[in-house]
Amino acid sequence: MDALDGNAIAGQLFEVFGVDLTTASGTCAGCGAVAPIAELSVYRSAGVVARCRSCDAVVMVLLSRGGSTRVDLRGMASLEVAEPNGATS
């Protein structure tokens, strides 16, 4: 099975979170690598599995069924999302 990049799940993530997460930085819980979601290796089957490009650990699983989507992020130690339009708190 050929891997896609994280841009392949941009639409699904936007539907769930309401923001573009492709530029968000995720930290792999396995190896500590930090990379944009767009750089994950994505595999589609019954659901979607996203893996760290550095260590191949599963960092995200997306399962859609019955009108809902489950997002499992247990392989991601953290996710940093920039505030929209450069807003500051």
Regions found by a protein language model. Name each.
Residues 28-31, 52-55:
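Short cysteine-rich clusters marking metal-coordination/redox-active sites
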Residues 73-89:
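Short, charged, intrinsically disordered terminal tails
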Residues 40, 53, 64-65, 74, ...:
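Surface loops and adjacent helix of pleckstrin homology
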Residues 37-38, 61:
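Short, non-ligating residues that shape and space the ligands of small metal-coordination modules
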Residues 40-49:
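Short linker/helix segments within small regulatory modules
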Residues 11-12, 68, 87-89:
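Basic nucleic-acid-binding interfaces
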Residues 1-24:
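A broadly conserved sequence feature marking short terminus-proximal activation segments
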Residues 56-70, 81-82:
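Short metal-binding segments enriched for Cys and/or His
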